[in-house]
Amino acid sequence: MSLLTEVETYVLSIVPSGPLKAEIAQRLEDVFAGKNTDLEALMEWLKTRPILSPLTKGILGFVFTLTVPSERGLQRRRFVQNALNGNGDPNNMDKAVKLYRKLKREITFHGAKEVALSYSTGALASCMGLIYNRMGTVTTEVAFGLVCATCEQIADSQHRSHRQMVTTTNPLIRHENRMVLASTTAKAMEQMAGSSEQAAEAMEVASQARQMVQAMRTIGTHPSSSAGLKDDLLENLQAYQKRMGVQMQRFK
C-alpha cells in the first residue's frame, strides 16, 4: 500500500458515512494526484462543510496544507489552529513538545506513527498544531505518520462507541438504529437508481421503505417490528442490480 493510500484510508475512517464522505474522498484523491492546487479555495470549502467535528476539519486542513503546494506567506486558517490546540490544555502542549522532539529524530512514516501512538489524542492534536503553525518542522512523511496515529486513536474510540450501540440490549435503541439504517439505505438506493426506466422499481421500493419508517415513528411501534428492514431493502437492491447486470454482493 502506498503512503498516500494509507493516509487516505486513515483520514476517511474518522469521517461519518454519507454523501459528504464521498465528496471528501474525491477531494483527497485529487489533492494526492496533484490535480487540486488551490489551497485557499480548498480550505474555504472545508471550513463550511456541515456535520464534521472541528477536530476532523483540523486534521483534514492539516493534510491539505501538507500536500498542496502553496506560497510561503499563505495565511494559516483559524479554524484549523483552534481545532489543533489540544483544547488549550497546557498538559497537552507539554506532551506535544516532547513528542515533537522525538518525531524530529524519526525519518519514516511508520517510525513516526509508532512513536505517536503512545500519546493521547489531545497531545497528538497539539503536536499537529505546532507543525501547522510553523513552530516546528518535520518531513511530510513523519507528519503523515502523526496524522495516521491520531486518526487511528479517534477511529478506535468511535468503533468502541459504535460497538456499544450495536450490542446494546436496549430494544428501543436497537429499534431506532434499524430504522435509521433502513432510511439511509433507502436514500442510497434512490441516489444509485438514477433515472433509467428499470430504476422506477428500485425507487418505488425505497420510497415505500421510507414511508414505512416514517409511519412507524409517527404511531410508535413495537421495537421488534423493525427487524430485518434494512436486509429486506438490500435484497431488493441486489435483485435490481442483478437485472441491470451489476454484481455487488458486499453490501451487508
From Swiss-Prot:
Keywords: Host nucleus, Membrane, RNA-binding, Viral matrix protein, Virion. Residues 165-252 are annotated as: RNP-binding. It comes from the Viruses. GO terms for cellular component: host cell nucleus; membrane; virion membrane. It is found in: Virion membrane; Host nucleus. One of its GO terms (molecular function) is structural constituent of virion. HAMAP family: INFV_M1. Most abundant protein in virion. When expressed alone can form virus-like particles in transfected cells. Homodimer and homomultimer. Interacts with NEP. Binds ribonucleocapsid by both interacting with genomic RNA and NP protein. May interact with HA and NA. Cannot bind NP without genomic RNA. This is Matrix protein 1.
